[in-house]
Amino acid sequence: MCIAYHPSLKIKYGRVHPKTIAKHGVVSAAVTEEMADGIKKLTNSDISISSNGIAGPKNEMYSSDQSGTLFLSWNFRDKIKKTKRFKLEGGRNSVIDKAVYVALSMCLRYLKNELRKDN
C-alpha cells in the first residue's frame, strides 16, 4: 500500500503524469485512475486500489463543503477498471474508515465474482 498525500509522491510512486494534475487537479478522478494503474504496474499485482480525496476538516486549501469528497479507483487484472466519486459524511476518521470499507467491499465483490467464474 502506498499513501501519497503530496503531488510529487503521486507522480513518483503512483506514476501520475504531472499534466494530469495540472489539468484536473490533485483531487480528481483522473489522478485516482492513473494512480491505480501506476501502482498496479509498479507492483505487478492482479488488483490495485487507489483513493484520493479530502477527508477533512476544512483548512486553508479546502472548504467545508469539499470535506468528505472521495475518489476510488480499482484495477482488476486490467480487465475491469472502475472509478467512482463519493461524498462521505462525518469527521476525518469516520470518512477514512468509510473509504476503506467501500474500497475493500468492491474488491471483495470482484473476488467473489472471479471465484464464481472458476467453479
What label would you give each PLM region?
Residues M1-N119:
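Short alpha-helical segments enriched in small residues
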